[in-house]
């Protein structure tokens, strides 16, 4: 019985560690690196948080959209006002079928600096979605995103 419990515990910890491996640390300079990595590619960047109830409600819908549009460049950024436990962030992403998306989490306690790098006018409201076209032009969706609008934007970008 104890061996079974110990084995289950080890497997559980290994699973959590594997999920966390997909979570990148978002600190100073990460936004410019992220933008450079996706330069010239239509990209959806969704900012969400564990402490944001509307974010948690819409997460499974983002997972469905990603499954529906496997070629879509979707970047999920956990942008809680206070950095959260990476394991909890990874678990939420996995539950929403987003564990294999490009996932980041704010790790700087001075998140105002991170938000300023992204958009000097952003006060930190969540959820927030940026639709970035091939030319780098951003469309900002503040609040729960209308995924029909996101799909329509993806269609204009020829993203499936």
Regions found by a protein language model. Name each.
Residues 16-20:
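Boundary at the C-terminal end of the N-terminal hydrophobic targeting segment
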Residues 4-14:
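Bacterial N-terminal signal peptides
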Residues 22-43:
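A short beta-strand-turn-helix
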Residues 126-160:
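Thiol-/selenol-based redox modules, centered on thioredoxin-like
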């Amino acid at each position: 019985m104890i061996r079974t419990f110990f084995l289950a515990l080890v497997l559980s910890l290994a699973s959590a560690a594997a999920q966390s491996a997909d979570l990148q640390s978002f600190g100073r300079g990460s936004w410019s690196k992220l933008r450079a990595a996706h330069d010239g590619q239509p990209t959806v960047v969704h900012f969400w948080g564990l402490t944001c109830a509307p974010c948690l409600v819409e997460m499974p819908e983002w997972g469905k959209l990603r499954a529906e549009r496997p070629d879509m460049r979707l970047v999920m950024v956990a942008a809680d006002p206070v950095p959260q436990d990476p394991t909890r962030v990874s678990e939420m992403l996995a539950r929403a079928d987003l564990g294999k998306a490009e996932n980041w989490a704010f790790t700087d306690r001075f998140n105002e600096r991170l938000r300023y790098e992204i958009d000097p006018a952003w006060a930190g409201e969540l959820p927030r979605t940026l639709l970035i076209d091939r030319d780098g032009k951003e469309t900002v969706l503040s609040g729960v995103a209308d995924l029909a609008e996101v799909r329509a934007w993806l269609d204009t970008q020829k993203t499936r």
